[in-house]
Amino acid sequence: MKKLPYIIILFIGFTSCKKALEEKAYSNTYTKDFYSNAAEAEAAITAVYGNLYGMYNSGAPFFASDWSADQTFPRNVVGRNTLTQFSYDAAYSVQNSFGRVNESPMEIWKRAYITIESANWVIAKVPATPMDAVRRDNIVGEAYFMRAYCHWTLTRNFGSIVVKINPTNSIENTVVGKSSIDEVYKQIFDDLTKAQQLLPDYTPTFVKGRVSKQSAQLLHAKAALYNEKWADALTNAKAVIDSKKYTLVPSFTDLFTAAKKDLARQEILFDVELNNTTNPVRQSQVHFFYAPNGSSDYNKGGAGGIYVYSKFYNSFITGDKRKDLLATSYTNTAGTFVPQASIDTRLATKDLVLMGKYKDPNSVGAYGSNNIYLLRLADAYLIAAEAEAHVNGASANAYSYINEVRKRAVIPNLTAGLSQQAFIDSTLQERSWEFYGEGDRWYDLTRTNTFLTVIPTVVNADYPVRTPTAKNRYFPIPQVEINANAALEQNDDWK
């Protein structure tokens, strides 16, 4: 069979269990008997969420972005260091050779299109499913949201991408060319408009992990921010805030305490729901990489390997509670105090900083229960602050939005009387303190085109020189995908 540019997988089942079907191009005959009742429609949308889990459990969306930025870095080993050193090529040759594909942008491309494919089938088939009409609309709205999220994930990583809005039912319709970035965003906004119309408002009785109308509004706001549609970003961020459906968790530490993740749901608009069981469907392994080797406070099976730059650690305002999840020492399982210089003797850098956002002392080996947060209410406030400043300058409203986040961090209100640009810069800094380790910072640097000046200043003994160039704003489209799709062209800077 001809190799497809997208790996196409459909999961079916009548419970939370999922069965992967043989990889193949779909036909109408192949799917004619599915989506015929409510149970199958529910199974189909559950599979869409499950496919997204496959992307995030690998860590690729975090690692590809965070290791390129100025907050966290990986242990300097071959294959893992190419993102931090900007030494990858269009074929991701080193990652392929040294078994690091699951940490690379290749995984983002593959998993995003798997999820889009499954969402497309829901959008195409479920509207005709005989079932409760309200729930049917909700399911289709969830699929529109997920398709928008994946297209947005792709475009912020790769720039111009293939927009895929129809399910694959032949080999021929997999040979599709790229759309411009503007065209991609048009599709994203169209999908999110439909999602908002079909999704319900959030309530505390929501099924865990499901998206709401407010989730679609916040994703719309964030996509508009990236697309520099400031008024649109402001309108949608304000809609989330003004709905009062979500509230900030009072304690930043509680927000990232695995045992309190039900409490955290009051702030989380979209996440990947995970657990610490040996069930391979919903394991979390993100915590495994951030924990020092042998620390029951972090988890029961951590290997270490991802650390925080000391420059970022030292950037916090005195008393900022967000810094409490960073540490320069730890106590190991034997009860021995481990000082900063001995955190990881494999590295040349001796001013290592540990990150505790993904601690899980009740982990089962490599499996933790930390959910992965993709959209939370703090983002709505900071998007509103930045967008308001672009539209109306450093207004009282702009200050009120950013200070809401600073209040939770227990730091003073932002200095009054800032210029428009100084306020926007302060908002970007606030985002850095708020969302470190959540796969966000690199995109703030690239969308503002500040990565070329910021990154070279963030170095250490293991990465003494870091020199991104203009082409690093977007990752190259994996060469294997271009080889499989005659209509797909590489990004101009990577040809």
Describe the predicted segments one by one.
Residues 1-27:
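Bacterial Sec-dependent N-terminal signal peptides
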Residues 16-18, 23, 35-38, 54-57, ...:
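Long, intrinsically disordered, low-complexity segments
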Residues 37, 42, 46, 50-56, ...:
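Conserved, well-structured interaction surfaces
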Residues 83-98, 314-376:
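Flexible, polar/acidic helix-loop-strand segments at domain edges
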Residues 230, 394-395:
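TPR-repeat structural position
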